[in-house]
Amino acid sequence: NAPTTKTLRPCREESVDFDNTQNLYIEGDNLDVLKILRENYLGKVKMIYIDPPYNTGNDFVYNDDFSQTSSEYIAESGQFDSDGNRLVLNTESNGRFHTDWLNMMYPRLKVAKDLLSDDGVIFISIDENEIENLKKICDEIYGAQNFVSSIIWERAFSPKNDAKYLSDSHDY
């Protein structure tokens, strides 16, 4: 959890009623932003909701610090071959599939814990790919005694005929 040297700058021209609003929209690398927020909101946040990448093998590429535009990054990063085929993914075959995802999540959850008030809560959306691993690191960071429940919601109503009274069409 190294400190960040980054700062937040308001975009007044892109804001609606900037001087009177009590809300913030923040865009940037979420780990850097969390570290910046920690400076002023340490122990003050009542609720955090995060919806991280689900680690399906095709939903994101690691180590993007967003210091370049998307097109610059894609052009310079070697993610695609000359035919436009993606070369860099966190695929299950790379041998570090779960480890890469957990290494991305762990520092973010640690900083998020610093933001939470004593009676604060965190909600995390996830699917079946990483729910067990996410539960383990959350137990380590937040304490297993603080876990309340997994909330299961149906993504889309689509009754299946392959299992009587059971459905696998849900997220957590």
Give the location of each predicted region.
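A short acidic (Asp/Glu
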Residues: I36-L37, D59, E132-I137, N161-A163
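Polar, glycine-rich mid-to-C-terminal structural blocks
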Residues: A156, A163-Y172
